[in-house]
Swiss-Prot record:
Disulfide bonds: none annotated. One of its GO terms (molecular function) is ATP hydrolysis activity. It comes from Pseudomonas fluorescens (strain ATCC BAA-477 / NRRL B-23932 / Pf-5). InterPro entries: ATPase_NBD, Heat_shock_70_CS, HscA_NBD, HSP70_C_sf, HSP70_peptide-bd_sf, Hsp_70_fam, ISC_FeS_clus_asmbl_HscA. Keywords: ATP-binding, Chaperone, Nucleotide-binding. Belongs to the heat shock protein 70 family. One of its GO terms (biological process) is iron-sulfur cluster assembly. It comes from the Bacteria. PANTHER family: HEAT SHOCK PROTEIN 70KDA (PTHR19375). This is Chaperone protein HscA homolog. The lineage of its organism: Bacteria, Pseudomonadati, Pseudomonadota, Gammaproteobacteria, Pseudomonadales.
């Protein structure tokens, strides 16, 4: 059946003319480019017949080297050879310093706290390094397809935040690529397996690459992909397996933990070779310098068990978020070269109670799926109809309200693209400006969420508190990028911002935000209720104080005023504590003792308005 076609700007106005578009898997360890040829999606090889391009960039004084030769030069030229740059995309220098032991580079801070890597050609940003990899893939594709590309679908981990996604788009632009869309890697894998055409039900995509882990739970209905939930870890992957083996070698060989960059690189290469050998063998002899020892698969499994357990914990969380049971998952797709590790496959099979799908090369499956989507977005009709992909945002988006509270506007796991609006008002009389603080996270207090951006809405007409109506609109596009606007509906004044944070989340912060939201859910609810009661109490105190200053002497006797002021003082003292119930009850008492005063003020206002006017004037 024909499904709803995704139509985006730039599609071909000539549907019978095939436009050249590719899918790119920009990976931590390796990258690939794929395209549809003769109706089949396949990876494109270079002149030597190699499909996989190592994500390695080596800088010389007068040229740039990309790929396998650059990777092999890493031990001898570690400071000019950049590996695993995907881990640095969208991050700040402070984040990078936490990875210092794993990254043998010299870093300098650039604009917006971006880390630059010192090379023989000068400082290079992660965006520039990634652009070199993308440039080679673009040139390979144009040579293989015999023409200029109209664009590419580039895959990213589902857990990439706004900064990391924007950095990826910037790298593509620098490489001369038009980005048709950023596509979550797990979703691309589902497309590659043709699950949109042959299956209905719930599918899990387990994606363990070189530097990142993603789990996505998809529901497939009539060819439509709906991502029910996503999870993962931006700092978990095959690189960590290598570091675990390297640690085993250091301990066994009695090496110093403080190694120079070249030694670190050669050590990691030996560790990686051992890991790959254990994929098919029960044991491997590891040789490092004069030291040699046998590493068995059982010992290797024990080394990586904590990391495998971390991935399964994220899987259980994603299944819970999707509101499905484990036995409802009908298929598990394995993605990423690290899923070749036998212990990983065993653990996934044990958890889901079924053997995972591994028929398509896990290193190629993402690029193959991205190419299918790229062909559709380029305007080329897909045999069997088009497909609709519904991705989701990984963390809730919202803004700060009075009392330091997080008001969620778009909940996590909402399908994108999406636009949501919510109305807010002013807190004080005569307020003419409002600060809009955009946040990301699952907790109730802003101190426990991540700040994304701030902007001011100015020019609000002065009114009494609560009279102005400000509509705040959140929009998340198909690439997961956020824009926020605020508009005062009466005057039409408006302000907006596109959220492009200068760096991303620190290692473990994404997973920790979700973990904390569950762990502290009860405490957060109590804290939110307390803050709301404190805000209500403060608002009442300010209103009563304003009324006393304006009309207290005229409308109250000394005893009445003293009673009100005593109740205000007691409420102020309670607000400094944490007894929410006491604050609520005292707020009610203050409201009650001021009822008569409020009625007198209203009568006085009405009398003043009617003074000197006859009945006929009022009726007119």
């Amino acid at each position: 059946m024909a499904l709803l076609q995704i139509a985006e700007p730039g599609q071909s106005p000539q549907p019978h003319q095939r436009r050249l578009a590719v899918g790119i898997d920009l990976g931590t360890t390796n990258s690939l480019v794929a395209a549809l040829r003769s109706g089949l999606s396949e990876p494109l090889a270079d002149a030597q017949g190699q499909v996989i391009l190592p994500s390695a960039v080596r800088y010389h004084a007068d040229r740039v080297e990309v790929g396998e030769s650059a990777r092999l030069a890493a031990p001898t030229d570690p400071l000019n050879t950049v590996l695993s740059v995907k881990r640095l995309m969208g991050r700040g220098l402070s984040d990078v310093k936490q990875l210092g032991e794993q990254l043998p580079y010299r870093f300098v801070e650039g604009e917006s706290h971006m880390p630059f890597i010192e090379t023989i050609q000068g400082p290079k940003s992660p965006v520039e390094v990634s652009a070199e990899v993308l440039k080679v893939l673009r040139q390979r594709a144009e040579a293989a397809l015999g023409g200029e590309l109209v664009g590419a679908v580039i895959t990213v981990p589902a857990y990439f935040d706004d900064a990391q996604r924007q950095a990826t788009k910037d790298a593509a632009k620098l490489a001369g690529l038009n980005v048709l869309r950023l596509l979550n890697e797990p979703t691309a894998a589902a497309v590659a397996y043709g699950l949109d055409q042959h299956a209905e039900g719930v599918v899990a995509i387990y994606d363990l690459g070189g530097g990142t882990f993603d789990i996505s739970i998809l529901r497939l209905t009539g060819g439509v992909f709906e991502v029910l939930a996503t999870g993962g870890d931006t700092a978990l992957g095959g690189d960590d397996f290598d570091h675990a083996i390297a640690g085993w070698i250091i301990e066994g060989a009695g090496l110093s933990a403080d190694l120079d960059p070249g030694t670190q690189r050669s050590l990691l290469q030996a560790a990686c070779a051992a890991k790959e050998a254990l994929t098919g063998a029960a044991s491997v002899e590891v040789v490092y310098g004069d030291w040699r020892a046998t590493l068995t698969r059982d010992a290797f499994d024990a080394l990586i068990e904590p990391m495998v357990a971390r991935s399964l914990k994220a899987c259980r969380r994603a299944v819970r978020d999707s509101n499905v049971e484990l036995d409802e998952v009908q298929a598990v797709v394995m993605v990423g070269g690290s899923t070749r590790v036998p212990r990983v496959r065993e653990a996934v099979a044990e958890m889901f109670g079924r053997q995972p799908l591994t028929e398509i090369d896990p290193d190629q499956v993402v690029a193959i799926g991205a190419a299918i989507q790229a062909d559709t977005l380029a305007g080329n009709k897909r045999e069997g109809g088009e497909l609709l992909l519904l991705d989701v945002i990984p963390l809730s988006l919202g803004l700060e309200t009075m009392g330091g509270l997080m008001e969620k506007v778009i909940p996590r796991n909402t399908t994108i693209p999406v636009a949501r609006a919510q109305d807010f008002t002013t807190y004080k009389d005569g307020q003419t400006a409002m600060m809009v603080h955009v946040l990301q996270g699952e907790r109730e207090l802003i101190s426990d969420c991540r700040s994304l951006a701030r902007f001011e809405l100015r020019g609000i007409p002065p009114m009494v508190a609560g009279a102005a109506k400000i509509r705040v609109t959140f929009q998340v596009d198909a690439d997961g990028l956020l824009s926020v606007s605020a508009r005062e509906l009466g005057s039409g004044v408006e302000a907006s911002i596109q959220v492009k944070p200068s760096y991303g989340l620190t290692d473990g912060e994404i997973a920790k935000m979700l973990k904390d939201s569950f762990q502290y859910a009860g405490d957060d609810k109590v804290a939110r209720v307390l803050r709301e009661q404190q805000v209500d109490a403060q608002r009442l105190i300010e209103a009563v104080q304003g009324a006393l200053d304006a009309d207290g002497e005229r409308l109250l006797d000394a005893e009445e005023r003293m009673v009100i002021e005593l109740q205000m003082q007691e409420l102020s003292e309670l607000m400094r504590g944490t007894d929410g119930y006491a604050i609520e009850q005292q707020t009610k008492r203050l409201s009650q003792v001021t009822d008569a005063f409020a009625a007198r003020r209203l009568d006085s206002t009405v009398k003043a308005a009617l003074a000197g006017r006859n009945l006929n004037e009022i009726e007119e």
